[in-house]
Amino acid sequence: LILAITMGWIDVANISAIMFTGLGLLLTINITSGLFHIGFYDELTQIGNRRALLAAAKTAGNQYSLAMIDADHFKKINDRFGHDLGDQALRVIASCISKVGCGAKAFRYGGEEFCLLFKGKSQAEVTDCLEQLRQAIANYDMVIRDKKARPAQCAKGEKNRGASRRHSNLRLTVSVGVVDSSAGGSFEQLIKLADRALYRAKAGGRNRLAFA
């Protein structure tokens, strides 16, 4: 429409130039915004992706905590119920971790693994928030029903829990590995330490926190 109007006024140089400039700016803004979203946000969960995490790490400062979070028995969920429900489970977890508080920023690290970055916080300062998150996910009964009827939001799922017994329920849990910058090393090294703590949590029975 803008282009059509512009072409209609092509004989008026000033107006035509202004309209072409406006169209160019709008297209540039839309393309840039779209590319940024594709580059830094996870398509499935709509939270930051690994690239966004690494960008955030550059401004994390000298004091921060990391939590690596992994969905327990996720392969079994996919194998038993299919990838559609597996994707829904990831959206539920992403919704929950994006509301964790304590100033955290949530990211999908890859697969069923997520990361929380707490700038300016020590490990001790984020433990309660992470324990509340673990409990919130463990208390969330994901109702297995028709795909269109499934709630994608953590809070809505908790509200609806127990409303109907005609459907089977899936209990989600996560294991969490925690480290803070006092452990020393680069950001990538701290991620590895948090990952090791995460797998200790899994080895210890899952659905728990472990610390580096």
Give residue spans per PLM region.
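Catalytic core regions of nucleotide second-messenger enzymes
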Residues: R108, A138-V174
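Conserved nucleotide-binding and Mg2+-coordinating catalytic segments in signaling enzymes
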Residues: H37-A55, I69-H83, R91
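Conserved metal-coordinating catalytic motifs of nucleotidyl cyclase and c-di-GMP turnover enzymes
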Residues: T45, A67-D70, G111, A194
